[in-house]
C-alpha cells in the first residue's frame, strides 16, 4: 500500500536522525513536482493541505491523485491534514481515506486544547490514523487565521509532556520562534527551549513555519529532535514569482502546459533543497 500514515515515517526519522519534509500543496503542478522530486531522490515526503486546499481541490480528488502518483512512482506517500480545527471536518476526511491529521486547538486554553485534541485522537486511532497537535502558537497567517507576533506563545517544555501524555498524540508541533510566511529578517530560534522539550517529550517533534529558514538552523533543529519540517510559503513564492516573470517576458504565452514549466522548475529547486536540508535523501 503506497498511501501511508505519517507515524512510521516520523518514527523512522527519529531513529535515523533526519527529518521528513511536509510540503503544502495548492494545485496539481505542486504535487507533481513534490512527488517526482521525492521519487527521484528516494526521499520520504508528506503531502499536506490546509482546510482551504481541501476545499479548493476536493478531498476525493486529492486522495485519488496521491494514490495514483504513489503507485506510478512506486513511492510511499502520506496525505496530511494541516491545521485542521473542526472535529466533523476531520472525521469526514478520515472516513474518506486520509491517514494523517493535525488537529490545531493551540488557540484554546491548555485544558481545552487537551480536551479537543484527545477527542480527535480517540477517533483517529480507531482508524489507524496518526495525529499531530500543536502546543503554543505560531505568528503569521495560515489560511484566514492571523496570529499577532506579540501574542504568539512558545511551547512550555513541562506542559509539553503533560499534553503528550494526556492526549495520546503521535507527534507534537512546537513553537520556538518560527512563523508562517517568509521572514523580513532572520528569526532567532530558541534552541535551548527545543532541547529542553526533547528532554521532556520522546515523541517525534514537528517544526512549522520553516519557509526561509537557513540550512544551518534547520539542521540544528533536527539535531535537537525535530522529525518533520513544514514548508508552504517558499513553494508558493517560487511558483508565483517564476510565473509572473515568465508571463512578463512572454506576453504572447497562452498555453498553461508551456508557461507552467518555469514555475515547476522553480518549485523543484525548493523541494530539492528542503530534502537536502532535512537529510532524508535515500531514506524512503
Swiss-Prot record:
Specify the superkingdom.
Bacteria
Give me the residues that bind Zn(2+), please. 83, 180, 208
Enzyme Commission no: 4.1.2.40
Pathway the protein takes part in? Carbohydrate metabolism; D-tagatose 6-phosphate degradation; D-glyceraldehyde 3-phosphate and glycerone phosphate from D-tagatose 6-phosphate: step 2/2
* One GO-annotated biological process of the protein: D-tagatose 6-phosphate catabolic process
Record's cofactor remark: Binds 1 zinc ion per subunit.
Coiled coil (UniProt feature)? none
**What are the record keywords, sorted?**
Galactitol metabolism, Lyase, Metal-binding, Zinc
**Which residues make up the binding site for dihydroxyacetone phosphate?**
181, 209-211, 230-233
Q: Name one GO cellular component term.
A: cytosol
Catalytic activity field: D-tagatofuranose 1,6-bisphosphate = D-glyceraldehyde 3-phosphate + dihydroxyacetone phosphate
* Disulphide bridges, residue numbers: none
Return the InterPro entries for the record.
Aldolase_TIM, Class_II_FBP_aldolase, FBA_II, TagBP_ald_KbaY/GatY, TagBP_aldolase_GatY
Q: What class of enzyme is it?
A: lyase
The cofactor required is: Zn(2+)
**Which Gene Ontology molecular-function terms are recorded?**
tagatose-bisphosphate aldolase activity; zinc ion binding
Q: What does this protein do?
A: Catalytic subunit of the tagatose-1,6-bisphosphate aldolase GatYZ, which catalyzes the reversible aldol condensation of dihydroxyacetone phosphate (DHAP or glycerone-phosphate) with glyceraldehyde 3-phosphate (G3P) to produce tagatose 1,6-bisphosphate (TBP). Requires GatZ subunit for full activity and stability. Is involved in the catabolism of galactitol.
Q: Which NCBIfam families match?
A: cbbA, PRK09195.1, PRK12737.1, tag_bisphos_ald
Protein family per UniProt: Belongs to the class II fructose-bisphosphate aldolase family. TagBP aldolase GatY subfamily.
The protein's assembly and partners: Forms a complex with GatZ.
State the protein's name.
D-tagatose-1,6-bisphosphate aldolase subunit GatY
Its lineage opens with: Bacteria, Pseudomonadati, Pseudomonadota, Gammaproteobacteria, Enterobacterales
Q: Which gene encodes it?
A: gatY
Amino acid at each position: 500500500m503506497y498511501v501511508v500514515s505519517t507515524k512510521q515515517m516520523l518514527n523512522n526519522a527519529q531513529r535515523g536522525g533526519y527529518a521528513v519534509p511536509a510540503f503544502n500543496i495548492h494545485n496539481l503542478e505542486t504535487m507533481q513536482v513534490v512527488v517526482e522530486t521525492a521519487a527521484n531522490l528516494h526521499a520520504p515526503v508528506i503531502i499536506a493541505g490546509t482546510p482551504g486546499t481541501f476545499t479548493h481541490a476536493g478531498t476525493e480528488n486529492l486522495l485519488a491523485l496521491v494514490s495514483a502518483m504513489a503507485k506510478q512512482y512506486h513511492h510511499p506517500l502520506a496525505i496530511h491534514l494541516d491545521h485542521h480545527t473542526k472535529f466533523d471536518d476531520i472525521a469526514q476526511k478520515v472516513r474518506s481515506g486520509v491517514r494523517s491529521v493535525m488537529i490545531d486547538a493551540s488557540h484554546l486554553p491548555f485544558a481545552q486544547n487537551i480536551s479537543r485534541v484527545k477527542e480527535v485522537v480517540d477517533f483517529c486511532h480507531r482508524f489507524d490514523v496518526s495525529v499531530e497537535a500543536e502546543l503554543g502558537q505560531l505568528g503569521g497567517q495560515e489560511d484566514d487565521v492571523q496570529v499577532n507576533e506579540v501574542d504568539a506563545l512558545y511551547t512550555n517544555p513541562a506542559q509539553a509532556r503533560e499534553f503528550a501524555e494526556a492526549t495520546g498524540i503521535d507527534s507534537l508541533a512546537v513553537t520556538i520562534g518560527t512563523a508562517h510566511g517568509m521572514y523580513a529578517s532572520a528569526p532567532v530560534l530558541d534552541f535551548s527551549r527545543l532541547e529542553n522539550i526533547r528532554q521532556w517529550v520522546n515523541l517525534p517533534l514537528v517544526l512549522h513555519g520553516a519557509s526561509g529558514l537557513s540550512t544551518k538552523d534547520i539542521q540544528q533543529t533536527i539535531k535537537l529532535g525535530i522529525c518533520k519540517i513544514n514548508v508552504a510559503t517558499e513553494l508558493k513564492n517560487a511558483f508565483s514569482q517564476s510565473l509572473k516573470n515568465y508571463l512578463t517576458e512572454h506576453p504572447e504565452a497562452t498555453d498553461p502546459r508551456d508557461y507552467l514549466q518555469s514555475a515547476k522548475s522553480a518549485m523543484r529547486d525548493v523541494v530539492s533543497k528542503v530534502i537536502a536540508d532535512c537529510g532524508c535523501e535515500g531514506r524512503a
